[in-house]
A protein has these predicted regions:
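Acidic, glycine-enriched catalytic cores built around paired aspartates
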Residues: 1-190
């Protein structure tokens, strides 16, 4: 939904650049178009920040997708039901795509499930769960929200209490599924 948010915000609502200029920038992987890249990455509403501008677009896209897929017949006599559990297909799809209107460069993975685009969630984990809870999780076969923390972020009793409060809040807002990766940069490098 960040790609659509970028188009709506920058091309239509604020006329920061034209659609042709955006497409040219995407085709060039934003090389030579750093001004556009800066606008779409840093000055555009993004999903995962509890920003209704971006979150309303996510809800609208989800509802259109759900309404189109759910109930359609399968080739074996069943019906389709939408889910938001991509496992690893976000990596493949990102790898075969050009750059996106939100500043994701070519060949970079897409977001995971209902997780915000990597680096887009700048207002913290509470804002992420508030954004995610705006969709109706009960209308899916499942959703996937990945949250990443450094070990220091959840260290000690206070850290564990904060994590527990985040989980409780998400489920109180009718969130469905959340999983965590707790690892530091050095461990990933090793």
């Amino acid at each position: 939904s960040d790609a659509l948010s970028s188009i709506k915000f920058n091309v239509f609502d604020n006329q920061k650049f034209t659609m042709k200029e955006l497409i040219d920038a995407m085709n060039d992987d934003f090389k030579g178009h750093e001004d556009i890249l800066n606008l779409v990455k840093n000055k555009t509403p993004k999903y995962g920040n509890d920003d209704d501008y971006a979150d309303d677009i996510m809800v609208s896209v989800f509802n259109e997708y759900k309404d189109y897929i759910t109930g359609r017949p399968t080739t074996r006599g069943g019906v389709y039901h939408v889910d938001m559990l991509p496992t690893t297909c976000h990596v493949y799809f990102g790898d075969v795509m050009i750059a996106s209107p939100n500043g994701r460069l070519a060949h970079i993975p897409l977001s995971e499930g209902i997780s915000p685009e990597k680096g887009a969630d700048i207002n913290g984990p509470t804002a992420v769960v508030k954004s995610c809870s705006k969709m109706n999780h009960c209308e899916t076969g499942g959703t996937l929200l990945n949250q990443k923390f450094t070990p220091a972020a959840i260290a000690g009793e206070k850290g564990i209490d904060n994590l527990a409060a985040l989980i409780r809040s998400y489920f109180a807002m009718n969130g469905h599924h959340m999983q965590f990766n707790v690892i530091d940069r050095q461990t990933l490098i090793e």
